[in-house]
Amino acid sequence: MNDKDLKKLTAKSLGREKAELVLKNAQVINVFSEEILVRDVAVGDGMIVGVGQYQGREEVDLSGKYLCPGFIDAHLHLESTLVAPPELIHSALQWGTTTFIIDPHEVVNVAGEEGLDYMLEQTEGLAANVFVMLPSCVPAVPFEENGGVFTAEKMEPYLANPRVLGLGEVMDYVSVIGAEEEMVKKLRLFRERIKDGHAPYLQDKQLAAYALAGIKTDHECIDYAYALEEIRNGMQVLIREGSGARNLAAIVRGIRENNLDTGNFSFCTDDKHINDIQREGHISYNIKKSIALGLPPLKAIKMATLNTARCYNLTELGAVAPGYQADFVILDSLEEVAVHAVYHKGKKVEREKKIDIKPCSEQLRRTVHLPALSAEDLKLAVPDSPSSLIQMSEGQITTKHVRDVLPARDGCFVPNAQYNKVVVVERHKGTGHFAVAPVLGFNLGQGAIATSVSHDSHNVVAIGDNDESILLALQELQRVQGGYTMIREQRVLATLPLPIMGLISDAGHQAVESMLNTMVGYAHEMGVPASIHPFIALSFIALPVIPEIRITTRGLYDAVEQKFIRYIP
């Protein structure tokens, strides 16, 4: 702000000149004092110039309504919503989220810098604040087979972009606590910036070493006990409520029962599909659910606003006070977080608006390259004694490493609706690598499901109760260049194409939402438990940095012991 602008805004703040916009008689939520005050809010040049009694050239009477800061999503992968970034931003704005701190490591894992450039371009100039954390682990771990590599040297030019805040979630905690050279380079590059974490089950001295490296946040806490350990180590816990990982209830109950201060807690969605956003809400849902669990409304709103702004050093966001950007949400109900209207930089966000999607290169639409596999390729030899298998977890993306005697014929695993077969196939560089493993608890019968959304390398994953359906699902994803597909009784039941890097649809959010709802319904009809989101659960089954057991293109991997159970060279 230059001297001339400051002088002009000061006159409005003092009431000597009318403000451009005044929101009258609002019940203003003050996140500093945690109180509600009936006040006018005056806006000039996109900033809040005063909270008190004001006159404006335009006035809006908000008697009986609440006015609070715009909500902030502390950590999300826009790609995980399945729609183009402008579509998602517009949809989430309707639920009061005005600031998005994104980690585009999905697109960077597929397409390297071209993927990052796509995301920066797609989020430029929108009616929201979109900040970027540069992906730290591409690939997630050294043995992963992905499409891009993002080194410290490649990151450095992006630091000049004012929307780049810091380093994205550091998943390779082994490299952090081992002080490995490439990781140390990245940590040094971001020494003056915030660094996001990803530290499931790190404890004691390992967690201390991780925090010592300057890693500030974590969104992988699934219970209160672990969240408390991270708080004790000076970290900010980003309470996640997404489509597959729903951690909020366990943590918020712990906060309430132990009367823990909420200053080191924020909210995030991480990975949330567009249909769940449209049905439940975005960060508004985190707030609403927390209030329903007994958290005081003003504390929940503060966690969604000021706490996050302070954590990420966003000094003009997160509060309704002079000098803050005029991003706010008008609520009809505090407990229900019922959004009446949303403002960004003092302008009311349009509900009905044509969304302009910038085109992407043809190269980003041709990223699925699968080998031609046969039923013979999918055979998995198993002993008569118990074998390692992946057991799915209800309502979480973690898995359990269990051992069981598997159904077999002629020494080979025969899948069924209880013991499914999962296949991961490399899709980026045509290596032909793939791996097969048994899965317990997914319970899919009469067919198969496949996806090219498979964190974080985004190879193609298929699961089913028979080889023929699995092979047909793989062929269908090759045909449409990525997406979700379902096979039932040897026929393609439904497909949601995601042709942009195998991650993002080029259709509107309503079409994606409709197809996704249909496909999730089909999956549950075919036996997938209601507590498991079929596509989210499948998309994380190949991520080797989340406990306990995973499958990669190199074989079955023990994520706790950090070693392969079965390695395929």
UniProtKB/Swiss-Prot annotation:
- Spell out the molecular function terms from Gene Ontology: adenine deaminase activity
Write out the coiled-coil annotation as residue ranges.
none
Q: Tell me where on the tree of life, at the top rank, the source sits.
A: Bacteria
Q: Keywords on this record?
A: Hydrolase, Manganese
**One Pfam entry name:** Amidohydro_1
What EC class is this?
Answer: hydrolase
Its recorded reaction(s) are: adenine + H2O + H(+) = hypoxanthine + NH4(+)
List the EC numbers from the record.
3.5.4.2
* GO biological process entries: adenine catabolic process
Name the coenzymes or cofactors required.
Mn(2+)
Asked whether the keyword Hydrolase is assigned, the reply is yes
Give the family from UniProt: Belongs to the metallo-dependent hydrolases superfamily. Adenine deaminase family.
**Protein name as catalogued:** Adenine deaminase
> Which lineage is the organism of this entry classified under, starting from the top rank?
Bacteria, Bacillati, Bacillota, Clostridia, Eubacteriales
Record gene name = ade
